[in-house]
Regions:
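Transmembrane signal-anchor hairpin modules in multi-pass inner-membrane enzymes, especially those
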Residues: 1-135, 183, 187-192, 219-234, ...
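Alpha-helical transmembrane segments of multi-pass inner-membrane proteins
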Residues: 30-42, 53-63, 85-92, 103-117, ...
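A membrane-periplasm/extracellular boundary helix in multi-pass inner-membrane enzymes
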Residues: 142, 146-151, 202, 210, ...
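Short, conserved phosphate/pyrophosphate- and ester-handling motifs at nucleotide-, phospho-/glycolipid
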Residues: 169, 263, 366
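TM-adjacent membrane-interface loops and short helices in multi-pass inner/ER membrane proteins
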Residues: 264-302, 311, 315-321
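Short active-site alpha-helical segment characteristic of glycosyltransferases
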Residues: 308
Length: 558
């Protein structure tokens, strides 16, 4: 796979190690950023909130310790991202789930921290960082292909015949490999044969949607570059078409279409949820606990598959406006002065690819993708940016805001790491963690393992758990059954089913309970009525557009 790495490419490796007076000032910072990018990539792309918070704090911290005198010359570029974090905090305290909501602020903190880094100094060498990133692209793509064929069971890198690589999620891995292809294509140090390495990795992910977006992004790149590469584009398009035909013959194309329809339904349900609290949102991460009440079809989704709607739900319409303002203003700056910006064609193509895929997937949950997006958008922070969109801040105010953000992210990092510890040991923790569904669930699970069923019921009642947290309610119901309080358990379970008629997992759990403990005649009549209502609902659009909807036969229960 290294056959395409020619002599020029090998000599180009010295680009990472040479002494250059122009970049020597920030060489240490940029080396640190490259190492951090590689570390986040290996750690599941920063999907874990604790890892994302630690990386965000580290990004801000290196600005302070690496430069005794720094100036945030373009802090106005960070205002919108800072607003996202503060709006998320307000939403978290107003209608969230304690530390659970705070943990879901990690992506927004990564946006803010990385933006601070790329606007903290005026002599930041973008070319140096991109030069190192190219080798990360090539090495990570080659390693992913090797693991796919040699060690397919390595840490979940391959699942159901699809390459998930470092993200353990095939679609986001496909986005990374598509960006890697464009990044290598934009480099004079790599040949078109070298570009085959990330392209093969992209094909192995079997992500049809990303493959189509990749062709679109490649077309944008070639148009902006004004390069006559019609045969090259045709070859890439042909290979993507072959992938689509193969997926169609294997039957997975039908599954992909069904998945796309399901995500459209999720967006519809998410908009209904957002309508209940449009200005401050429903709280970061609250989608997982709330969507069962509004779902229009039978699906299970802990995270909504639309990045923009996720921001709307987490922080309200103002948070979404702040994010879109940041992206749009940076894109305007890049387009306006793209002739003066190195790698502007790749930057535009990469940004478009990521922002389009945000519409139908969860890429925004990965700190690595967030960092890349801000890195590319920060090309609009140069001294030739649109002056009409700029307004000054005294440097003492900029530094004060930086230290304030550093303190907030440090606090969130501490809370999230302590929360992870409580989940691991199954402890209840201080009272401020009682509203956290995951902390409480593991605490109640530990009580169940110890046979303290009465304590589980008392704890559930004393915490006044929200009815939508079905996992916690099921622990209470199971404890009631174990205490031989079948009537109370049956009543709680039927109420939960009635509220969540399209919760497939809940139906399966209820079936197991009723098969084992039995059900009263009154309960059977009520259950049959719920079944009829559920069947009528899933036979109507939009649920009827999905083939995986299940009609339950409750009358067969013993």
């Amino acid at each position: 796979m290294l056959i395409g790495l020619n002599g020029d490419s090998i000599r180009g490796l010295r680009f990472l190690f040479i002494y250059d007076e122009v970049i020597e000032l920030n060489k240490r910072t940029q080396w640190t950023l490259l190492c951090l990018l590689g570390a986040i990539l290996l750690l599941q792309g920063g999907y874990n909130s604790s890892i994302s918070f630690i990386a965000s704090f580290f990004l801000l911290f290196i600005i302070v310790i690496d430069r005794s005198k720094f100036e945030i010359l373009y802090f106005q570029r960070n205002i919108s991202l800072a607003a996202m974090v503060f709006l998320g905090l307000i939403s978290s305290f107003a209608c969230g789930y304690g530390s659970y909501s705070l943990a879901h602020l990690a992506p927004y903190c990564m946006f803010l921290s990385s933006s601070f880094v790329f606007t903290s100094v005026d002599d930041f060498d973008f070319n140096y960082l991109i030069g190192g990133l190219r080798y990360i692209c090539f090495i990570s793509s080659a390693a992913a292909i090797l693991l796919f064929f040699v060690f397919p069971s390595f840490f979940g890198y391959v699942s159901a015949g699809r390459l998930q690589a470092y993200f353990q999620y095939a679609n986001t891995a496909a986005v990374w490999f598509a960006l890697s292809f464009l990044l290598l294509l934009d480099s004079p140090l790599f040949t078109k044969i070298d570009c085959l390495v990330p392209f093969i990795a992209l094909v192995l992910t079997r992500s049809v949607a990303v493959a189509i977006l990749f062709v679109f992004g490649l077309m944008i790149y070639l148009i902006l570059e004004k390069r006559s590469m019609a045969s090259f584009l045709l070859a890439v398009f042909g290979l993507v078409l072959i992938l689509c035909i193969y997926e169609m013959m294997s039957g997975r194309i039908v599954e992909s279409v069904q998945t796309f329809i399901e995500r459209i339904i999720q967006i519809y349900d998410g908009l209904r949820l957002a309508g209940s609290s449009p200005f401050i949102g429903i709280g970061p991460g609250a989608w997982r606990q709330s969507y069962r009440f509004v779902q229009s079809a039978q699906y299970s989704a802990n995270v909504i598959h639309c990045g923009y709607l996720q921001i709307l739900l987490d922080g309200g319409i103002f948070a979404l406006t702040a994010f879109l303002w940041f992206c749009i203003t940076r894109m305007i700056c890049i387009f306006k002065e793209r002739s003066n910006i190195p790698h502007s064609s790749f930057v535009v193509a990469g940004i478009v690819l990521m922002l389009l895929h945000f519409m139908v997937d969860i890429d925004i949950q990965f700190a690595f993708i967030d960092l890349l997006l801000v890195l590319f958008l920060s090309r609009g922070n140069e001294k030739y940016s649109i002056k009409e969109l700029s307004f000054g801040f005294p440097n003492w105010a900029n530094k004060g805001c930086l230290l304030l953000c550093l303190s907030i992210i440090f606090g969130l990092t501490t809370i999230t790491c302590y929360r992870s510890y409580l989940i691991e040991v199954g402890d209840r923790g201080p009272s401020c963690f009682e509203k956290d569904p995951e902390v409480t669930e593991n605490y109640l699970l530990r009580l169940c393992d110890e046979g303290e069923y009465a304590s589980v019921v008392d704890a559930a009642d004393s915490l006044r758990l929200r009815s939508e947290t079905s996992e916690l309610q099921l622990l209470k119901i199971g404890s009631l059954y174990c205490m031989d309080m079948r009537d109370d358990a049956e009543e709680c379970l039927l109420e939960l089913i009635d509220m969540q008629k399209k919760n497939v997992d809940l139906y399966k759990t209820a079936t197991a309970y009723f098969d084992y403990y039995g059900i009263s005649n009154e309960g059977r009549i009520r259950l049959t009525r719920i079944e009829n209502q559920a069947n009528e609902m899933i036979e109507r659009p939009p649920a009827s557009y999905l083939r995986n909807q299940v009609l339950y036969e409750w009358t067969q229960l013993n």
